[in-house]
Regions:
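Mobile-element integrase/transposase regions
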Residues: 76, 81, 88-143, 149-150, ...
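Double-stranded DNA-binding cores of transcription factors and transposases
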Residues: 1-12
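Charged alpha-helix within mobile-element recombinases
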Residues: 194, 201-291
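Acidic/histidine-rich, metal-coordinating catalytic segments
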Residues: 158, 171-194, 216-218, 223, ...
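Mobile genetic element proteins and their domesticated derivatives, centered on retroelements
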Residues: 40, 65, 83, 123, ...
Length: 361
C-alpha cells in the first residue's frame, strides 16, 4: 500500500529519513456545449412526466439518458457520471441517506448464474383495485436473473393454477430456466396440511426439468432481481396512473412488459435491452402443445431446494411444521436443503458439503 501524505519512510540502505514524493495529476475539466446539457435535462423531465409514448415507462437515471444520447449519435458524448452531476446540480436528484446494512452472512448459498435462463425469479404483487371496484387484482412477475428479460400478467385470483398457466406461457416465449426461485407463499409452495407433498407448481416445474428453489421465509430481498423490478413497477405503473377498466389494466400491463424488454438499456447488459441481450442465446423452449393438465405429474424425478436459516435450537423448518434437527453448532448459518424426489431423501448442504441426510417420504 502507498504511504499516506507526509508519512516517514526508512531507506533500507540508510538511517536517513525522507518524505515520499507526492505526484499530482492535473485535472482536465471537460466542457460540453450547453445544448447537450439542456438536452439531458429535458430528457430527464420528459422521462419523469412519462407523457410521451416513448417515455411512458422509461427509466430516469443518468445511465439511461447516456444510452439514449449514444443511440442518437450525440457528440461529444458526456459520460454517465457527468450527466449525473448535471442532474444533481439541477435539483433532479435527491441525496438518499444511506441505510446501515448488516454484512452478508457468508454461509448463504448463492446460486451460480453466468448466462441467460439459468435462474428465473417469480413473485406476485397485490391485491390492488380498479377505480370504484372491489374486485381484487394481482400482478404476477417473472424475470431472468442474468438477462433481465421479464414477463408480466394480471390475475384475478391468488391461486396456483393460473400461476402455472402463466409460467408455461412465459417459458414457451422466453425459454425455461434451470431453476425457478420464489418465496414460500402457499400459491407457490402448496398446502400446509401435507407439507411433504409437492404442490402442482413444483410438479410442473419438475416435469419440465426446472428445479424449484424456495428462499428463506420472511426474507423477500433474497429475490433481489425481481424485488428491484417490483419497485420500478410500483413507481412507473401502479402509482403513476389510475386504471378505469380491466381491459385498460391488461393493455397497460402488456405495454409495460414490452417497454421493460425492448427499451430499458441496462449497465448490467452493457447498454443493451433484455431483448437484444438474449436474442442470440439458445434457449430451452417449452413445446406449444404442452398441457400440464393432461400430464402424469406423479411419477417424477428431480430436486426441490429450500434455503433455510438454522435457528438457535439447531433446527430448520422446511415447510409448515416440518422441522429437522441439523445441530446446534450450525446455529445462525444458512443451509441448502435439497429434496431428491426419486430417492425420497432430504440432503442438507453447508458450503456445498453434505452435512446431514434424512428420509423424506
Amino acid at each position: 500500500m502507498g504511504a499516506s501524505l507526509g508519512q516517514q519512510i526508512r531507506c533500507p540502505f540508510s538511517r536517513r529519513k525522507f518524505k515520499k514524493p507526492i505526484l499530482r495529476s492535473k485535472k482536465i475539466k471537460e466542457t460540453y456545449p450547453k445544448k447537450i446539457k439542456d438536452l439531458v435535462l429535458r430528457s430527464r423531465k420528459e422521462r419523469e412526466a412519462g407523457r410521451r409514448p416513448a417515455y411512458k415507462y422509461a427509466l430516469i437515471g443518468a445511465e439511461s439518458i447516456y444510452y439514449e444520447l449514444r443511440e442518437l449519435g450525440i457528440s461529444p458524448l458526456p459520460p454517465a457520471r457527468t450527466i449525473h452531476s448535471w442532474l444533481k446540480q439541477a435539483g433532479s436528484i435527491r441525496e438518499r441517506k444511506g441505510k446501515i446494512r448488516k454484512p452478508p452472512n457468508p454461509t448463504y448459498p448463492v446460486l451460480s448464474c453466468k448466462t441467460v435462463n439459468v435462474i428465473h425469479e417469480l413473485d406476485l404483487k397485490g391485491p390492488f383495485y380498479l377505480k370504484g371496484s372491489s374486485q381484487k387484482y394481482y400482478l404476477v412477475v417473472l424475470r431472468d436473473v442474468y438477462g433481465k428479460k421479464a414477463a408480466l400478467k394480471v390475475l384475478t385470483e391468488k391461486e396456483m393454477e393460473p400461476l402455472i398457466d402463466f409460467l408455461v406461457e412465459s417459458w414457451q416465449n422466453m425459454g425455461r430456466p434451470k431453476c425457478l426461485q420464489m418465496d414460500n407463499g402457499l400459491e407457490f409452495r402448496g398446502s400446509n396440511r401435507y407439507p411433504r407433498s409437492l404442490g402442482k407448481l413444483s410438479r410442473v416445474c419438475l416435469d419440465l426439468g426446472v428445479e424449484p428453489v424456495f428462499i428463506p421465509t420472511r426474507e423477500p430481498w433474497r429475490n433481489g432481481v425481481i424485488e428491484n423490478l417490483n419497485g420500478l413497477i410500483q413507481r412507473l405503473f401502479l402509482k403513476a396512473q389510475t386504471f378505469e377498466t380491466e381491459k385498460h389494466l391488461r393493455r397497460e400491463t402488456k405495454n409495460l412488459e414490452t417497454s421493460i424488454n425492448t427499451t430499458h438499456r441496462l449497465p448490467a447488459l452493457d447498454g443493451k435491452t433484455p431483448q437484444e441481450f438474449s436474442a442470440r442465446v439458445r434457449i430451452r423452449s417449452v413445446s406449444p402443445d404442452y398441457d400440464w393438465r393432461t400430464r402424469n405429474l406423479r411419477l417424477l424425478k428431480g430436486k426441490v431446494s429450500f434455503i433455510r436459516l438454522v435457528r438457535k435450537s439447531g433446527r430448520i423448518t422446511l415447510t409448515a411444521k416440518d422441522k429437522f434437527f441439523i445441530g446446534k453448532k450450525y446455529k445462525w448459518q444458512y443451509v441448502l436443503a435439497v429434496v431428491d424426489v426419486l430417492q425420497k431423501q432430504l440432503n442438507i448442504y453447508l458450503y456445498n458439503k453434505l452435512i446431514k441426510s434424512f428420509a423424506y417420504k
